């Protein structure tokens, strides 16, 4: 989903927090809904969205098409546009906070953000967050270099596979697909997907495990460089994650998402980001 793959920068938690706390607040208010990529907000006591009438969205700015830095240097993406549309429906303001993905739980629990909205997989995390209803179908997939003879999972035996730290793909390969991962020479993790795909293109690794949207974006950008294996690692759903117990905010967002589907806004946004591999067919909340 988007060019800010630092969604889960592979740095220590203390470093992640220092980075986030040191950056300036980007306020979106009722305007265009896009903050400057030059900085991020300082942590502060943020109430739930429904109570404060403000969405403070934590997102990974290198995760196209859901959240990334546009050509104009402004934050953009499907989920950010969707968050702005929801805020408008509810009469809320919206702030965008580009975060280190490793620090998302600390930032949410501290109140520096009041939701995580950026291609956020809900399966396996239900005990840790209060979620909106799921809105988008997603898959975890494997991407390899084109024309190197890797056509199936079996061909990855003895190969080096890389994924993003604390990603859904890592969870799958360390959980339901751990037997597959055991056949790899190594399963490496890295802070952001842009670098992972650079390593794949250079031959430093043999495959990248990632969200379908990331794969589609990379394949669209470099169709002669990469190929996606046919068999997905898993299927899952995206939802908006709130601090555990913030049911009021989650319900309000779900209500607005359904309304945005009904009035055609969701279809328009899916079409806007179609070139990034996003499909209206994957929308599930109706």
Q: Where would I find each of the regions flagged by the language model?
A:
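Extended ligand-binding regions for polar small-molecule ligands
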Residues: 29, 80-89, 159, 165-168, ...
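Periplasmic-binding protein-like
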Residues: 61, 137-144, 216, 220-255, ...
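Bilobed "Venus flytrap"/periplasmic-binding protein-like clamshell domains
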Residues: 61-64, 75-88, 120, 141-194, ...
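A ligand-binding cleft/hinge motif common to bilobed small-molecule-binding domains
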Residues: 103-106, 119-128, 172-175, 201-235
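Bacterial lipoprotein signal-peptidase II cleavage site
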Residues: 25-40
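N-terminal secretory signal peptides and thylakoid transit peptides that target proteins
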Residues: 2-18
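Short helix-initiation/N-cap motifs at beta->coil->alpha
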Residues: 80, 96-106, 187-198, 236
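Acidic, polar ligand-binding/catalytic clefts
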Residues: 84, 93-155
């Amino acid at each position: 989903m988007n060019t800010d793959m630092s969604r889960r920068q592979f740095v220590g938690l203390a470093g992640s927090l220092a980075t986030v706390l040191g950056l300036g607040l980007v306020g979106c208010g009722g305007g265009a809904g896009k903050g400057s990529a030059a900085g991020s907000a300082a942590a502060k006591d943020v109430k739930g969205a429904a109570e404060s009438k403000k969405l403070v969205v934590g997102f990974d700015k290198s995760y196209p098409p859901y959240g990334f830095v546009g050509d104009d240097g402004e934050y953009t993406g499907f989920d950010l546009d969707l968050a702005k549309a929801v805020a408008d429906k509810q009469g809320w303001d919206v702030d965008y906070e580009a975060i280190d993905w490793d620090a998302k739980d600390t930032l949410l629990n501290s109140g520096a953000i009041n939701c995580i909205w950026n291609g956020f997989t809900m399966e396996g995390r239900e005990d840790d967050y209060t979620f909106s209803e799921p809105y988008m179908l997603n898959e975890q997939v494997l991407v390899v270099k084109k024309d190197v003879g890797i056509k199936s999972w079996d061909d990855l035996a003895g190969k080096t596979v890389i994924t993003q730290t604390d990603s859904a793909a890592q969870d799958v390969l360390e959980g339901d697909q751990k037997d597959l991962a055991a056949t790899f020479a190594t399963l490496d993790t890295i802070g952001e997907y842009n670098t992972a795909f650079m390593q794949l293109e250079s031959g430093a690794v043999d495959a990248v495990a990632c969200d379908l949207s990331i794969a589609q974006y990379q394949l669209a950008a470099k169709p002669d460089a990469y190929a996606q294996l046919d068999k997905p690692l898993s299927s899952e759903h995206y939802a908006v994650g709130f601090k555990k117990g913030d049911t009021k905010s989650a319900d309000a967002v779900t209500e607005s998402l359904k309304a945005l589907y009904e009035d055609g806004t969701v279809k328009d946004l899916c079409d806007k980001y179609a070139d990034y591999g996003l499909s209206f067919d994957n929308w599930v909340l109706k």
